[in-house]
């Protein structure tokens, strides 16, 4: 009986070739679109899931009441502290921002992600110190930390501590090596610096995160 049904199906496919071709192509496109959409959704939903307590960390966005720009990904620096002090449900809050930047070492040009952060970011994002000191967290200093991955790329087997990188027009001294976070993340970084602290609410330049209890 099954053989009979298969035989009839093939006969119909051969009899109505154009319609069969359109149906098969449409079905293939549908399955392919579904598979690609599923992969994309999975990719988007796995950002930073490797972090400890990832299900308790939230990205704060700001809605403007003065224009039609909608939600903004940047927030004022004082917002993180205000949220933690105002809402007891918030265990921790932090400010950070990252962008791709060029730097020079021995007149050779390199490229990496430069991330500025406050002290709370170090704990919330589990930034692991391999060697050196945490002087790179001192505001307005010329100290920076780089990842072990970037250190290997730029210096090879040479110890990078004490070496200087020219970032923009500033000579920044490497005082620490931190562990690279190569997992799927919104915040890839190679260089770490302290964020510029300000009490101005009318200037939005950083990204705020909160960790709920």
Regions found by a protein language model. Give the residues of each.
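Membrane-proximal extracellular/periplasmic loop immediately following the first transmembrane helix
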Residues: 37-102, 204-212
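Short acidic/polar micro-motifs at solvent-exposed secondary-structure junctions
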Residues: 62-72, 95-120, 126-144, 182-184, ...
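N-terminal hydrophobic targeting signals that begin at the initiator methionine
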Residues: 1-3
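Mid-to-C-terminal secondary-structure elements
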Residues: 118-131, 144-213
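A short amphipathic helical element positioned immediately N-terminal to and/or at the very start
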Residues: 5-14
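Short, strongly hydrophobic transmembrane alpha-helices
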Residues: 15-43
């Amino acid at each position: 009986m099954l053989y009979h049904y298969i035989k009839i199906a093939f006969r119909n496919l051969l009899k109505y070739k154009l319609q069969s071709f359109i149906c098969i192509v449409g079905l293939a496109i549908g399955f392919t679109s579904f598979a690609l959409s599923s992969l994309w959704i999975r990719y988007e939903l796995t950002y930073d899931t490797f972090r400890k307590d990832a299900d308790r960390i939230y990205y704060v966005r700001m809605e403007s009441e003065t224009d039609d720009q909608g939600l903004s990904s940047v927030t004022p620096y004082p917002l993180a502290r205000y949220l933690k002090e105002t809402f007891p449900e918030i265990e921790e809050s932090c400010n950070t921002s990252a962008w791709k930047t060029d730097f020079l070492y021995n007149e050779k040009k390199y490229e990496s992600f430069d991330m500025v952060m406050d002290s709370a970011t170090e704990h919330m994002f589990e930034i692991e110190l391999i060697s050196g000191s945490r002087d790179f967290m001192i505001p307005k200093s010329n100290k920076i930390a780089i990842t072990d991955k970037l250190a290997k790329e730029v210096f090879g087997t040479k110890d990078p501590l004490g070496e200087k990188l020219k970032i923009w027009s500033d000579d920044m001294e490497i005082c620490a090596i931190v562990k690279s976070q190569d997992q799927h993340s919104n915040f890839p970084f190679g260089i770490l610096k302290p964020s510029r602290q300000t009490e101005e609410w009318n200037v939005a330049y950083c990204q705020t995160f909160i960790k709920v209890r």
